[in-house]
Every structure is written in structure tokens, then in C-alpha cells.
Amino acid sequence: MEKYLSVTTLTKYLKMKFDKDPYLERVYLTGQVSNFRKRPTHQYFSLKDDHAVIQATIWSGIYQKLGFDLEEGMKINVIGRVQVYEPSGSYSIIIEKVEPDGVGALAIQFEQLKKKLTEEGLFQERFKQALPQFSKRIGVVTSRSGAVIRDIITTVSRRFPGVDILLYPTKVQGEGAAEEIARNIARANQRDDLDLLIIGRGGGSIEDLWAFNEEIVVRAIFESRLPVISSVGHETDVTLADFVADRRAATPTAAAELATPVTKLDVLAHLQNQEKRMVTAVRNVLSKKQEALKKCSQSVIFRQPERLYDGYLQRLDQLQLRLKQSLRTRISDNKQLVQARTHQLVQLSPVTKIQRYQDRLGQLDKLLGSQMALVYDAKVAEAKRLSEALLMLDTSRIVARGYAIVKKEESVVDSVESLKKKDQVTLLMRDGQVELEVKDVKTKEI
């Protein structure tokens, strides 16, 4: 009778076979990356060829040490172990080591970082700085013992003696080299007395030159305030430092030549040329001045110098005449002004004023006397006239002349209209008075 196995039993059996099979403990496999999507931790994807596919896993610790990123379609060679995953009954390879097929890992890492930094714009020409024509002090980031620093010092001293070289001794390959290169670039930028910076090393393999391909070094060069010349490896060697530097030199000697574009001989030649130009210019000026002097010496003024000031003598005579006339006019005007002011002072003198007031007072006194006499005579005549008028109005004088006066209640009656029948009136006469009663009132016809 046949015995049936459960799926779990069969899967466990296959897992045991896979785990104990020495050929599956370390498998060398080549294939093409498929279904790859980068994850923040472990990486899960497929390896395939033209006829088969196997699932693959790379733990995060191993993937971070690769130095490059896997990409869809990339051909790789891997070393790992094959295992069975029981829940799904599938098998996969756990990868422990990865190498690109045909192209080295560093080459892929180089291209990937180059692409990334290019997209950020770090290699654009607009960020390149111009190198100074004359540098007083040049900083060099390289090894203390290498031939690079010797070549730079020799070339700079030959081309332009007096330029200072400041060396920043730096580890240029191996572990920690990239960090030290970036750190010394930053140190150099903290100084105010440097004009230029050269970074570099001699030739070597891509591994030897790799520190100059590290992102930390590339960004340090990009952020440098100082212009940077990169001289890494030989002419055929190209690093990312070369792309980001302001200028690239194939050799240390070429870097030193770029750092001193103007040589001592160039300066001397320039000075000699300037000297010749100055001498020529001075000679031309002297020639022109001599010619001008010759013309002046031959002019009429120098042959008959008295003509030089004839016009001025005439002008002087005219000015003297005008001055005399002006003085006479000023003196005459001042005399008249003094006379006028003297007359004003005399008129304003207190003695003059008192005398004038006394004369006026005498005139007024005489006028007042005559006027008072006239007024007195007029008043006397007026008084006489009024006195006579008063005498005429005196009732005793009236009745003495034979007239009688009628009074009613102590008032003189001067019209019949003020009387009526039976009014009691008094009749005043020269020698007495009579009491009467009005019998009748008759108005006189006019």
C-alpha cells in the first residue's frame, strides 16, 4: 500500500536536502537583475537568464558595502547559498557577494556617482573659477613623500621664484584618505593668504586613485572658495575630482604651470617692452616740446618783447585815468554829503530848535495879544447890547412909559386866546394894580 506525504513533510525533506547538499552551500551564479526596486533595508529581486528565474535576497549589511547600486537589467556574478522557503515551497539564493559581470564594481560606482552629480549640476562650466594670473602663495593637498610635491616646487621655483608653496600633508589612498583630502581642502579655504589650491597624486590603479572619486572629495572641491587645479594620476586617468575642479592637469608639472601662467621671463619681457614704450613715449613728448619751444622762440613776441606788454601799458593808462576820475567823483560826492549832513546837524541842534521856538513864541504872543483885544472889545459891545435888551424887557420901565401889563395867575397874558369869560386877571400899572374879571373876549380881525 502506497504512503502519501503531506506537503509540509515533502517541503521539509527538500529543505533538509538543500541545507545538507555541499554543492548548494556555496553557489557561483551569473544572471541578469530583474524586478529590482531599491528598498531601505534588505533587497529582494530575481536573477534570470534566457530559460529560468531564481529569487534572490541581499541582506542590508552586505548591500551597503557594495559601493554601487543594482539596476534593472544589470548582469552580475554572485556567490551565495540556496535555501528553501517552507511557507511558499519556493527556493531562492541568499547572496553574500556581488560583482558586475564584465565591468568592475568601482567602474559602475564611478558612473553612477558621476550621473548623480551631473544631474545636480556640479560639473557645469558656469561654476568654474578663473585661475589667478599672479599667485603669492599656493596650497598643495598631496602626500608629503611623493614626487608630486617635488615636481610642483621645482616647476614653480623655475617659472616664478618667490611664490610660496604651502603643503597640506595628506593620505591620498586607502582607508580614510577621502575624508582627509576633504578635510585639508576645507582647512586651506579657511586661510586668507592663499590664492590657489592644487590637489593630486601620482599614477596608479583605479583602486589607488579611488579616494579622488569619493563624493565627499568632489563636494569639497565644488564648495572651495579657492580655485582648484586637479592633478590625479597620469593623462589617461580620469577621476570625478577632474570633472569638478576648475582646471585639470595631466601631471604635477602641468599643474604647476597652470598655477603660474605668467613666468619670470614673461614679466621681464613685459617690463622691457614697457620700458621701450615709455622711452619712445618720452622721446616723442620731448621732440614735440622742443619743436614747440623752437616755434615760440621764433615768434614775434620773443623777437620784439616790448610788443608783449604794449597792450598792457595802454590798459594801465586807461585804468589810471578811470581811477583818477573815480576818485574825484567820490571826493565831490563825499563833500556834498558832508555839507548836507552838517546842515541837517545844524537844523537838528537844540540851540537852533530853542531859538526857532522862541521866535515862534514871540509871534504867537503878539498874535494872542491882538486877538485878545479884539475879543475883549467884541465882548464888551455884546454885553452892552444885551444889557440894553434886558432893560427893554424890564416891566417897571414898560409901565413907567404909560403901558399896563395883564397877568393871569402870575403869567403875562400876551393874547386874548389865553383868556375866557369870568377869568380873574391882574392889571399892572405904573402906580399899582387892579383886579379884574373878564366880561367878554373878542378876537381882533386880521
Swiss-Prot record:
Keywords: Cytoplasm, Exonuclease, Hydrolase, Nuclease
Gene Ontology molecular function, alphabetical: exodeoxyribonuclease VII activity; nucleic acid binding
Domain of life according to the entry: Bacteria
Major enzyme class: hydrolase
Gene Ontology CC terms: cytoplasm; exodeoxyribonuclease VII complex
InterPro entries found in the cross-reference section: Exonuc_VII_L (IPR003753), Exonuc_VII_lsu_C (IPR020579), OB-fold_nuc-bd_dom (IPR025824)
GO biological-process terms attached to the record: DNA catabolic process
CDD domains: ExoVII_LU_OBF
Enzyme Commission identifier(s): 3.1.11.6
Reactions listed under catalytic activity: Exonucleolytic cleavage in either 5'- to 3'- or 3'- to 5'-direction to yield nucleoside 5'-phosphates
Subcellular location: Cytoplasm
Pfam families, per database record: Exonuc_VII_L (PF02601), tRNA_anti_2 (PF13742)
NCBIfam families for the chain: xseA
Assembly and interaction partners: Heterooligomer composed of large and small subunits.
Family: Belongs to the XseA family.
Protein function: Bidirectionally degrades single-stranded DNA into large acid-insoluble oligonucleotides, which are then degraded further into small acid-soluble oligonucleotides.
Name recorded for this polypeptide: Exodeoxyribonuclease 7 large subunit
Source organism: Streptococcus pneumoniae serotype 2 (strain D39 / NCTC 7466)
Gene name of this polypeptide: xseA
